[in-house]
Design a protein with these regions (language model features):
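A Rossmann-like FAD-binding core segment of flavoenzymes
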Residues: 228-247, 251, 338-446, 450-452, ...
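FAD-site-proximal beta/loop scaffold in flavoenzymes
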Residues: 281-311, 402-405, 411-416, 420-482
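Short hydrophobic core segments
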Residues: 163-164, 258-268, 396, 404, ...
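C-terminal, flexible cofactor-proximal segment of oxidoreductases
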Residues: 483, 488-593
Length: 593
């Protein structure tokens, strides 16, 4: 069994006190300790330090209890500490301090700016607390190795666990299994994925807008799950009755067969075009690194063409960008592309900013239905103020190479249509003897076990997971991560003859970036908007990004984006010589004939 939460809370308390001491020294250097004491009516510096250390220790205990200890994850401990410090900055200086002095919090940009020194200190406190926590528990484990559960040898063949899918759900399942069965020889786990990397999909719009490099948001699966066998292969057949799957390791290579005792389906989803061939042929999706890179290069290529275009109709089509779907993905990608194009216009002297046109098509009357009505309206207003057009209550009916046709017959001339209006579960699921919902996802019970099958589990986008009220849980990375952890725990519990646990999860926060350093967020039911929401969005996603190296690279990309224009280098767009220049035979070379 994993170490107790109490132990981690105790070491977190010690680490918090250490981090708090360093923060106290920094605050005292600026003469701010007396302000802390003044919050409860005291004046001495000593009182301020004592109060500060007490709060820091309590916060540290919360860190240890919340994030727990996992060997080999010092980078995650630091990044979790950074986001934890950011949260305490919001709770403390931005919220509780104004309340205690009778002013009330405003969460304004001016208030956040005035508290910038406190922000820096809290981030350093969180990072050092995370590092201290990891170092303390690691040292304790080395000094007292008997606190770890001894290795358990199998009485017979090990239980074979096959996880199909290397996205958030599949990797979360694998990582949790590594923690639960690292010393247990009764289990043998294998992760199978067509890609050898975990893609951080929430950041794909920033790759498409040239704000981040593609490789910076992808982490090698072998690095994320170092103690699990990994197979880079596609699965083209699953035999549920005989507990085996057929693998295709690569083009031209022979098929392989693999047997399992427990199967985890984390196959994700694919774009769903509602049966329209025209959408399949003429729109851009945003599900993979290749999709994001292709869209980026296309946008830059049409800017290059528009800068030399003499036909006003063609130029209008080239400079019109349409996004279909007003959820998180559609809203974020249109905001990011707006920032990209307007931020690089100085490179294109023959394109005027007023010629750029951005249109979002959404079938409902409000965008971002996951947010509260107030934040949804705020987001709509902010994007409209920037010049983005919205056609709400409209549906796309067809697409061509130079236009999008709506259900009311309206035709929008454009060379760029981005589809975020719907996904469907992986088509492989339709070959299984399982009940599927309307979007092709497998129905599972409350334990995330496929209905009617005791040894097959499903999660993430390919599973129909219902909340206690019978409504489907949102298809988000947060839910996939939680589901992956629970599936791992339930598999181990089932093998051990224990009762599996039902899935219950309430998201701590919802975040959306609106471009131009603006965002909207709901954290524990509390709405945030503007610059503070944008900071929260970036802080959360940075903390969730796997691997310290990737976190540092993304952080530097963000910093550079504040100072420099975005990169406009085309990396894969073919040079269309026939479209831009006449052939040699058609040209007239005076004096050579």
């Amino acid at each position: 069994m994993p170490p107790s939460r109490t132990r981690d809370a105790i070491f977190g308390l010690i680490a918090g006190a250490i981090g708090g001491l360093l923060l106290a020294l920094a605050l005292q250097a600026k003469g701010m300790m007396s302000d802390t004491a003044g919050l409860i009516g005291l004046t001495s510096i000593e009182s301020g330090i004592c109060i500060h250390l007490l709060i820091s220790a309590i916060a540290g205990a919360g860190y240890g209890s919340l994030f727990r200890y996992l060997p080999g994850t010092y980078a995650a401990a630091i990044s979790n500490g950074v986001i934890y410090g950011l949260i305490w900055w919001i709770i403390g200086p931005l919220t509780l301090s104004p309340i205690l002095i009778g002013q009330g919090p405003s969460w304004s940009l001016n208030e956040a700016g005035a508290s910038f020194l406190n922000l820096t200190g809290h981030i350093l406190y969180g990072g050092f607390t995370g590092l201290s926590f990891y170092a303390l528990v690691t040292a304790f484990e080395k000094l007292f190795p008997n606190t770890l559960e001894p290795s358990r040898s199998p009485a017979g063949p090990p239980t074979r666990i096959a996880i199909i899918g290397g996205g958030f759900g599949g990797v979360a399942t694998t990582q949790r299994l590594e923690r639960l069965i690292s010393l247990d020889e009764r289990f043998d786990a294998t992760l199978i994925s067509e890609s050898n990397y975990l893609l951080f999909t929430p950041m794909l719009p920033e790759v498409a807008s040239s704000a981040l490099l593609a490789q910076h948001i992808s982490t090698p699966v072998r690095a994320a799950c170092p103690n699990t066998r990994f197979l880079r292969a596609s699965v083209d057949r699953i035999d549920i009755q005989n507990n085996k799957i057929r693998l295709q390791p690569g083009v031209g290579l022979p098929h392989e067969t693999m047997h399992f005792d427990h199967l985890v389906l984390a196959l994700g989803s694919v774009p769903f075009y509602h049966g329209s061939k025209s959408f399949e042929e003429h729109v851009f999706s945003l599900k993979t690194l290749e999709d994001a890179s292709r869209l980026r290069n296309h946008v830059l290529a049409v800017l290059e063409r528009a800068d030399v275009e003499t036909d006003p109709v063609k130029k209008e089509q080239q400079l019109t960008f349409v996004v279909v779907g007003g959820g998180f993905a559609g809203t974020e990608v249109i905001a990011e592309l707006f920032d990209l194009t307007h931020g690089v216009l100085h490179y294109y002297p023959d394109i005027d900013g007023d010629e750029l046109r951005f249109i979002l098509i959404h079938s409902r009357e409000k965008i971002l239905p996951e947010l509260s009505e107030r934040l949804g309206e705020y987001s709509l207003q902010k994007l409209r103020e920037r010049g983005i057009e919205f056609k709400l209550g409209s549906r796309a009916s067809a697409a061509t190479a130079d236009a999008l046709i709506l259900d009311d017959g309206d035709r929008i001339g454009t060379n760029t249509i981005i589809w975020t209006a719907g996904n469907r579960a992986n088509p492989l699921l339709s070959t299984l003897p399982c009940e599927l919902n309307a979007r092709g996802a497998i129905r599972v019970d409350q334990f995330l076990r496929v209905e009617g099958l005791a040894n097959v589990w499903a999660l993430g986008d390919c599973a129909d997971v219902k909340d206690p009220q019978g409504d489907p849980y949102p298809q988000t990375a947060q839910h996939a991560l939680k589901q992956g952890k629970l599936v791992a725990e339930n598999i181990v519990a089932t093998v051990n003859g224990e009762q599996p646990k039902p899935f219950h999860y309430r998201s701590a926060g919802i975040f959306v970036a609106l471009g131009h350093r603006t965002g909207a967020a709901e954290v524990m039911g509390r709405p945030f908007s503007g610059f503070l929401a944008w900071i929260l969005w970036r802080g959360l996603y940075l903390s969730k990004l796997p691997g310290l190296e990737k976190k540092v690279r993304v952080l530097f990309d963000w910093i550079l984006d504040l100072v420099f224009s975005r990169d406009i280098v085309l990396t894969s767009e073919p040079f269309e010589r026939s479209a831009l220049h006449p052939s040699v035979d058609e040209q007239d070379f005076p004096g050579e004939m």
